[in-house]
Amino acid sequence: EEVKDENTVIEKTIQSENIKLKEKIDKPINTKVLPKVSIAEQYKYAMNIMKSGDFEKAEIAFKEFVDTHSKHELAGNAQFWYGETFYIRQLYEDAAAAYLEGYQKYPNSSKAPENLLKLGVTLAELGEVEQGCKMIVNLKKAYPKTDASILQKSSYEKKRFNCN
């Protein structure tokens, strides 16, 4: 019952943010960068671009991956990393839009809890501290089996943004 209430809080917050961020999600990207290899190899290729520090090219690669393989088990992870390409460059509106899309489209992905956390953090970075804190504070209730490392990050972010 309590988890359902917390998820309702998150959903209401997301609905209000969704209106503001919707136009950011549909940014057209025309470039294709992924090689014609297996899906797993394409994901690995995109991750290697990310690790190399070419975040603009990684943005294109992860977007292409998600657009092409939206039903694949790695799509949720790719969506998270797509958001990270923006966050690293401090493009917080684009990052928030990507994390929001990841949370909504891939709620059962292994990256879903981190998507929710980073959505909260980016909202707080954008000055929407109250909304961001709702995401951060409710993370454990929304995803009770979250990794300890993500809960630790959540704790840190609660303190950083003075969340109650």
What is each PLM-predicted segment?
Residues 1-45, 49-50:
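Acidic, proline-/serine-/threonine-rich low-complexity intrinsically disordered segments
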